[in-house]
Structure formats: C-alpha cells, structure tokens
Amino acid sequence: MKTGNQFNTVALVGRSNTPGIAEPLTTLAGCIAKLGFEVVFEVDTAREIGISGYPALTPAEIGARADVAVVLGGDGTMLGIGRQLAPYKTPLIGINHGRLGFITDIAAADMQARVPVILSGKFEREERSLLEARIVRDGEPIYHALAFNDVVVNRSGFSGMVELRASVDGRFMYNQRSDGLIVATPTGSTAYALSSAGPILHPQLQGIVLVPIAPHALSNRPIVLPDDSKIAIQIVGGRDVNVNFDMQSFTALELNDTIEVRRSKHTVPFLHPVGYSYYATLRKKLHWNEHASNEDDTAS
C-alpha cells in the first residue's frame, strides 16, 4: 500500500460502442474534478459519449500528460489501452463495465467510493508483464506487436491442422500438429490459455506458458518457461494460419514464417483497492468455493 497524493492529472477511458456508458463516465469525471484533479478523456471515448469541457487526448498524449488512467469497461478495454500506455508506465485503475472482469476489479457500482480513495494515495500497486512479438519472413522482420494476455498462432476458418516448429532460446523443442499454439503471460493464463487446459499462473510469477490448442498428440501438454525465454514458432505446414495479439489484432502468415516472442521490457502498473486479493478474484470469476465457509477470505 502507498499513501500520499502523487496524482495531478487523471485520464478516463471508456469501453467503445457501449450503450449507457456516457452517464457513469460523466458522473465519475465530475466526481474526480471536484476533488481538485485535472480530468482528461481519451479522444475516442470523448467523441463517442459526446462530452465537452475536458481535454480529449490520444493514448500517446495521455501517456505524456496523465499520471493515472481510470478505465471503465471490460478486460478487452484494459488490454487495449494497457498496451498503448505501457511505454509511458501509466498506472491503470480498472472498473468493470463488461462481463467477466478478471483485470477490471472495481465494480461499477463502487467506483465513486473506491476511485477517490485510490487517487488519494491509498492503493496496492502491481506490475503486470507484457510480451513483445515480431514476425520474420525470409529473414526480415515484417511486423511487431505487444501483447498483454497472449500471442496465439492458429488456423482459421475450415482449414485443417497446422504444423508448428517450436524452439526456446535457440534449442529445438518439438514439431507439433494442432489447431494452434498459445504463448501467454501470467495475466493471460486465465484467458484463452485456461480454456485450452493451461495452468493458472499467479500474476507475480515470472513465467511464460505455452499451451497447445487441440493437439493431435495428447502428450503435447502445456509447459511453463522462464520469463527470459526467447520463443520461436515456425510455420511448417498448413494453410490459412494467423497470429493474434490479445485476440484484438492479427496478421496472416505464410509457410516458413517465424513468430519470435519474448517478454517485453515494458510492464503495466495496476492500482488496486487496499485489501485486493487475487484469490478472491479467482473464486468469484471461476465460481470456486460456491458454499461459503468461515475460513473464506472476505477481501474483494
């Protein structure tokens, strides 16, 4: 926990194309402004909700000017703005206005009570890791991207299995026939990787998990690697193969293309309310321990 006012400018970012989001964002902006903070809006958010009276900034301008960003939306909104603000080390406060909300941990109904407390300097800070990836074709890099959750190489449409050659730190691991391969951060271990039978990695664990998607050989199991590993995935066989970054952007691949993945030098700071518990999040979102007991951790 940290105390002491260290924020002056607060950026507000909202989930796009979301009916009903204008009112809570406008209310929150007024609440924060009354406390003496400068409030700015992400430019697309300001345009969508039609708000005026506050500066409308691009993500790069937010990174240069704002001390913290409050994100009202779902996990996808956090992933998108998190990647863009990572180079600026802008801390994020997540308010859940989506469905699952693994990384937006403040309920929308509680935001007017909880956000001012965090902005006053009372919070728990957590650094989340990112992946950086590049696609190499004919020996030349043709595309770069950051991923907060995962880098996913997979087949598309009705095409058959793909064959992938995976290497770690220049050492051959395996050739794999499957529907694809997920490279996930600890944050991403509760996303697509989890639905493909991957393990849950605590966010503070320094690791990267490789998770096959519907492998032809059942002996191809997920593996957790050190987070300084350099992973290379080559397209050996198959057609209509794509690589996705947080399932929000993708590019088509060709035979012999290689996707190189490693941990990014950037991290994304999350600011949680005091008393935040990752285990409480798992219980709530994954419906663990449905029958409460006296031994339950009551932290939210």
From Swiss-Prot:
Its cofactor is a divalent metal cation. It is an enzyme of class 2 (transferase). InterPro entries: ATP-NAD_kinase_N, ATP-NAD_kinase_PpnK-typ_C, NAD/diacylglycerol_kinase_sf, NADK. SUPFAM superfamilies: NAD kinase/diacylglycerol kinase-like. It comes from the Bacteria. Pfam families: NAD_kinase, NAD_kinase_C. GO terms for molecular function: ATP binding; metal ion binding; NAD binding; NAD+ kinase activity. GO terms for cellular component: cytoplasm. Its EC number is 2.7.1.23. Its main location: cytoplasm. Involved in the regulation of the intracellular balance of NAD and NADP, and is a key enzyme in the biosynthesis of NADP. Catalyzes specifically the phosphorylation on 2'-hydroxyl of the adenosine moiety of NAD to yield NADP. This is NAD kinase. It comes from Burkholderia ambifaria (strain MC40-6).
